Amino acid sequence: MSLATLDSMGGASTGSVTVTEQLNFWAGRRVGGRNSEHAEPVFEPATGRVLCQMVPCGAEEVDEAIMSAHAAYVQWSKKSGTERARVMLEAARIIRERREKIAKLEVINNGKSITEALVDIDVAWQCIEYYAGVAGTLAGQHFQLPGGAFAYTRREPLGVCVGIGAWNYPFQIAACKSAPALACGNAMVFKPSPFTPVTAVILAEIYKEAGVPDGLFCVVQGGAETGSLLCNHPKVAKVSFTGSVPTGKKVMEMSAKGVKQVTLELGGKSPLIIFKDCDLENAVKGALMANFLTQGQVCCNGTRVFVHKDILPQFLEEVVKRTKAIAVGDPLLDSTRMGALITKPHLEKVLGFVRQAKKEGGRVLCGGEPFVPSDPKLKGGYFMSPCILDNCRDDMTCVKEEIFGPVMSVLPFDTEEEVIRRANNTTFGLASGVFTRDISRAHRVAASLEAGTCFINNYNISPVEVPFGGYKMSGFGRENGQVTIEYYSQLKTVVVETGDVENYF
């Protein structure tokens, strides 16, 4: 969908859009897939109808994209940080100007509510704007050495970076991976999820309109095979991947063969701990934020909700009431708070977790069933009612495994020491949360939790200035914040002698 077509999105509605434009982008233009016999249908989650066809890129196309990116990198890396910042600020401005139309297209491809999608697009331009500000500040250090000698360091780009995105935040992930890469002087080849191929190419066109060299941000479509070609290409210097743990392991293994730098943002089964001295109203709202954004399809969601036994009845009463009131339906309506899950197989997988929880002794307090909206055009959509599971134990499947859907597992606890031990009893470590009025306890628990992020008296708030990433099997490296510059650049040390060389021999 070209930028010109994007401008016609103002009047688009659910079920009314079909994408026929080419979805790859390199050398400054859209490129069609050459392996049309391998085309895969992409479905609109809210209706179940075919939105477009995704044609995966093969070895020849991947090579063309990477060589295009490398040529652009040679030009871009020679620009000053201020010059790069100027172009990036223009890209942020264009996104901001077209946020509503981009958000609509994101909803049609992804299924989340328009209210959430607008926030996602805002985060995208804010991230590009933030790293534009960082670009002009990149600098090394000076070291005075004995005898008038000195040394200095140069912070240099890596080269061609690969970004592999997930389907829950398609446009935002493309922006948040490319922004620090471009700020440091790199180029990026980005592969979206095959379920959400539509909006990353819009970002590529926006970068081109803003003035980046042709090829600086390329988009290649495809699944696992295309991803493998990217990770194994000798011209690629770094891979940044967002997705599941099993796929992340494969990305790491493939990248290791070429000694490429890797950032992995993987899955989670994050704990949210609610102490009895909390503000219960805020704790309930936090639990909803921790479980039901993007239909529960968020890697850092706090899906293990530990509630002190003394307030468990009050918490359950209020959280069930609020959950039943969540408006599920047409994601393009402003009143909708939960849209459709990404695919029919994924919907069935999530519903299967609920069935398994019941077999293992869990009690469904609300939801956990297929939901059919009243609008006839949504009959084939992938909707379900948000679910609260009570009577959960730490050894249950729904508590141990990442569900990636709108399912909250509630677990009672008694003491602080007990709940910290139970919260850390997982192979994941992406996020965590604490609700308490006791400031000492809040910081004590935050220090004890084995997770890359800990939210205190809130949840799922991730400003672009703040680093985000995991512990343990949730990955390594960071996205967002100043520290991410270190993951998209390398240091060169230059040692200068101003006198004579010592005659050792």
Swiss-Prot record:
Enzyme Commission no: 1.2.1.47, 1.2.1.3
MF annotations from Gene Ontology: 4-trimethylammoniobutyraldehyde dehydrogenase activity; aminobutyraldehyde dehydrogenase (NAD+) activity
ATP-binding found in the keyword field: no
Residues noted as binding NAD(+) in the record, renumbered to the chain: 191, 243-247, 402
Active-site residues, as the UniProt record annotates them: 265, 299
Similarity comment text for this entry: Belongs to the aldehyde dehydrogenase family.
GO cellular component, one term: cytosol
Enzyme class (EC, first level): oxidoreductase
Organism: Oryzias latipes (Japanese rice fish)
Protein name per its UniProtKB record: 4-trimethylaminobutyraldehyde dehydrogenase
Catalysed conversion reaction: 4-(trimethylamino)butanal + NAD(+) + H2O = 4-(trimethylamino)butanoate + NADH + 2 H(+); an aldehyde + NAD(+) + H2O = a carboxylate + NADH + 2 H(+)
Species lineage: Eukaryota, Metazoa, Chordata, Craniata, Vertebrata
Gene transcribed to yield this protein: aldh9A1
Subunit structure, interactors included: Homotetramer.
Keywords assigned: Cytoplasm, NAD, Oxidoreductase
Tissue: Constitutively expressed in all organs tested: brain, eye, gill, GI, heart, liver, kidney, muscle, skin, testis and ovary.
GO-annotated biological processes: aldehyde metabolic process; carnitine biosynthetic process; protein homotetramerization
